[in-house]
Amino acid sequence: MSLADTIRSSLVPIHREGYRFIAAFGIGSVILGLLWEPLFWIGLLLTAWCAYFFRDPQRITPVDDRLVIAPADGIVSSVGPALPPPELGLSGEFTRVSVFMNVFSCHINRAPVRGRISLIEHRPGKFLNADLDKASMENERNSLIIESPYGPVAVVQIAGLIARRIVCWAEAPGEISVGERFGLIRFGSRVDVYLPREARPRVAVGQVSVGGETIIAEFGSNAPPPLVRVS
């Protein structure tokens, strides 16, 4: 592999949603630099951070209907039974896996399963810290129901304290593949996945999640949730 190919393969693509933000940071840096040169370098660092925030790396997604894949990068903040948002019309408790994204996480959201999108519902709300449990019901959110081979799976994008703009380009009705990009949330947020109770979690609270790659749950398995060790 040539040096040019090595450099090219090391560069992570930037999602189009970030272009105008990066341009604004760049123009602002130049203007501030005209006033005082050190401000230009500070602005340049912020521009680089903005570009890093909107990165859109390729992911290697396991393709198996039994597997549920992480919807986002971040930290698993909760795993356990919970009621889905009422606007989804899903009755009873589901198994919820929540992934919290901080401002340094890649904020592209991906489908955890394949299937038909039967519903997309946006609800206004508060902008509490997305890491709080009550944010699931009180914060602004955008929800999808995916009719998977093992039943309905709900994916909820939740706005956070800083992130106040949810983007979803999926459409209902429509088909979606596991690991497929369907949206993003700007500047720190959370994604909840609600699974039928027969799904067995394969992650623990505090575990690092890689969107489109980490297996967070499995259907058709009687194995208990994994034991974990912090070391």
Curated annotation (Swiss-Prot):
Protein topology in the membrane: Peripheral membrane protein
UniProt pathway: Phospholipid metabolism; phosphatidylethanolamine biosynthesis; phosphatidylethanolamine from CDP-diacylglycerol: step 2/2
Keywords: Cell membrane, Decarboxylase, Lipid biosynthesis, Lipid metabolism, Lyase, Membrane, Phospholipid biosynthesis, Phospholipid metabolism, Pyruvate, Zymogen
Stored Pfam families: PS_Dcarbxylase (PF02666)
Pyruvic acid (Ser) modified-residue sites: 189
EC number: 4.1.1.65
Catalytic-site annotation from UniProt: 189 (schiff-base intermediate with substrate)
Cofactor note: Binds 1 pyruvoyl group covalently per subunit.
Swiss-Prot/TrEMBL cofactor(s): pyruvate
GO biological process, one term: phosphatidylethanolamine biosynthetic process
Site (Cleavage (non-hydrolytic)) location in chain: 188-189
InterPro entries: PS_Dcarbxylase, PSD-A
A GO molecular function held by the record: phosphatidylserine decarboxylase activity
Superkingdom assignment: Bacteria
GO cellular component terms attached to this protein's record: plasma membrane
Reaction equations catalysed: a 1,2-diacyl-sn-glycero-3-phospho-L-serine + H(+) = a 1,2-diacyl-sn-glycero-3-phosphoethanolamine + CO2
This protein's record includes keyword DNA-binding: no
Subcellular location, principal: membrane
Localization per record: Cell membrane
Post-translational modification (record): Is synthesized initially as an inactive proenzyme. Formation of the active enzyme involves a self-maturation process in which the active site pyruvoyl group is generated from an internal serine residue via an autocatalytic post-translational modification. Two non-identical subunits are generated from the proenzyme in this reaction, and the pyruvate is formed at the N-terminus of the alpha chain, which is derived from the carboxyl end of the proenzyme.
UniProt function note: Catalyzes the formation of phosphatidylethanolamine (PtdEtn) from phosphatidylserine (PtdSer).
Subunit structure: Heterodimer of a large membrane-associated beta subunit and a small pyruvoyl-containing alpha subunit.
Family: Belongs to the phosphatidylserine decarboxylase family. PSD-A subfamily.
Stated name of the protein: Phosphatidylserine decarboxylase proenzyme
Gene name of the record: psd
